[in-house]
Curated annotation (Swiss-Prot):
Its main location: cytoplasm. The lineage of its organism: Bacteria, Pseudomonadati, Pseudomonadota, Gammaproteobacteria, Enterobacterales. PANTHER family: CELL DIVISION PROTEIN ZAPA. Homodimer. Interacts with FtsZ. This is Cell division protein ZapA. Keywords: Cell cycle, Cell division, Coiled coil, Cytoplasm, Septation. GO terms for biological process: division septum assembly; FtsZ-dependent cytokinesis; septin ring assembly.
Length: 109
């Protein structure tokens, strides 16, 4: 489906953005999250300039994203190691099973 205009409120300002209908709930949730972040920053930092608050919030979000990307990379690397270990274990078990089968076959001859 094509994007449709959606009105959202960010820190007291109205914004109209285009958004696919199936993503409107996510957009509204993101707007609520941003509003909460801006409000929390305003209280914590005592900064009243909205533009500064938006930049600080953007930097915080970028930092959080970088941390999550690092966690994802670490997790993927860990899973790759585990998969390699499992693969080696399976290959070793199959080789041993093959040797056992060969020995048993030789006993019957």
């Amino acid at each position: 489906m094509s994007a449709q205009p959606v009105d959202i409120q960010i820190f007291g300002r109205s914004l109209r953005v285009n958004c696919p209908p199936e993503q409107q709930d996510a957009l509204n949730q993101a707007a609520e999250d941003l509003n909460q972040r801006l409000q929390d920053l305003k209280v914590r930092t005592r900064v009243t300039n909205t533009e500064q608050l938006v930049f600080i919030a953007a930097l915080n979000v970028c930092h959080e994203l970088a941390q999550e990307r690092g966690k994802t990379r670490d997790y993927a690397s860990n899973m790759e190691q585990r998969i390699r270990m499992l693969q080696q274990t399976i290959e070793q078990a199959l080789l041993e099973q093959g040797r056992i089968t060969e020995r048993q076959g030789a006993q019957f001859e």
